[in-house]
Amino acid sequence: MSTKEQSVILLRKAALAMMAFEWIQVAMGSVSISSVLVLACVIVIPFPFYAALLWPIKRLASAAKIRKVVFWCLAFRAFMPIIGNVFANELLRIAPQVAVGVIAIILIINFTPDKFAIKFGFAQKWLFIPAIVLFYMAGFVPPSIHQTAVSSEEYSDDSPNIVLLSWDTVRADVLSLYGGTGLDTPNLDKFASRSVVFNDAVAHTPITGPEHSLMLSGLLPPSNGLRANVVSKMPDSVVTLPEMLSGKGYATGGFVSAYPMLGRFGFQQGFSVYNDIMGNQPLIRFKQLSPREIFWAGLLYPFLRASTKAFTSGPVVQERAIEWLNQQNREQPYFMFLHLYDAHAPYTPSPQFEKIALERIHSATPAAFDGNDAESMARYRAEIAMLDSFFGELLIEIEKRDPGLANTLIILTSDHGECFGEGGIHFNHVPSLFEATQHIPLVIHFPKDAGAGMRVNETVTHLDILPTCMFATGDDLESLPQDVATYPLQLAYSKRGMGYDMRGVYLEAQQTTLGDDRLRGWRTAEHKYLISRSGQEQLFDYRTNEVENKLSKEPKLAVDIKATLLNFFNALPILDGSVLSISAQDERAMGDLGYTD
């Protein structure tokens, strides 16, 4: 057998081995696997694999050439995650062609008859390098960017652009808009002067996933199937706000910054682009990559795991959103959902903001409920000051497309607040239904500055976001999904008020890790009634304080509010979400975010 014939056989075997190994890695990455298996896959296997793969070439090439081949293969593999991040958008567009090219190369190398392979030079060593290049390009596409083709109707010329901006974990009372001191938010204050400020906006839950599912579906968590972070998925049967807007011809983009907001929990529904890649730097994406993608650079995996994050900093997420926005047709209306997580613990503000906040630690109001939490609350304020600086930059980009915001609806809110000693809860929110977590900011800019400077005292909730957006596109309320009464917030300026005197609000804290401490509650104009899964009851005059449990002093009032709560809950349509198994990665990510048992 000639040397050329031998090279054909050896290269085919090498390519076949490469393909088989990659498919094993794909299969392993698609199921829940132990960390031991992952380490074996990404560290132990590559050495014999590359030795077996390159040995035939070493036998047929000079030492100088083999070093080049080895260097190319290893360098390409090590830098693959970085390249995948940098060129994510471009690679997404060509992913199908790349996949076809990979298959074609493998088929050519492995199944071309010998005489044709030898005649046309398929056995040449240079073919091996592009084969590796194409094959590994299949692993470039970040798996966490969801792109969906959404059928749509023709949009109306006067359809407004819609921006939903969520500042995670921002309680209302620390903002100057709501009476707080010691925190400068000049961009928010200027924005509020041309917007409508809602003084009594209330979150239904203190948990990131459920409250955002509520914003995007217009349904309470019991009715949309997502009542806790990570453990369940909002079913596809739930029609979401981006799905409705897509049906009206809107471009829809979602950009989120924390693990509970991953698309796999149902949040990507209706978005043409949903970017939920976690981490600021390319290497941080290791936690999101499959073993197939990191099997060579996996040498660093044990060291990187400790430093990886389950969230992404605000500037990175906002930059992704702005990049998407600038790619959209200026004639087409858009819906952009932007979720920023910076105010969530752990509090790590930029030094310039931290310095100012710490200087005001004793004068800022409200003070931390527990004095020992004062320094943490100061850093929390510094994080919010950072968010305000990001907001100023975002508004500039939005106004480039719509000068004066003549045709743009912008909703700025938060999913919940944070406790600094309230109820014995520190730097957390999950077990709380206190005002520290449930009273949240809500500021809405309506097109052409309608209602600018108004302040609305009536109680509103995140359930009103969906009808507000759809009402802006011309829909009437009867066509919208509702499990309880909701209101388009345009009523605030069109009728100089919301049109109701008092609105009771259903509350719940149902994260599964709370066990028997899971809560349901009802908030009236003056009182708040809470009952735990174990049956423990509390009644607060929350306008005055939430320290004294008035259950024994006002038992009849407690009975009446409890009856209202139970009647309301029993009338709700209940939808069970898809139950998800909790992986080791889920547990690590939630631990990184402070969600521990």
Spans of features found by a protein language model:
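Catalytic domains that recognize anionic headgroups
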Residues: 2-597
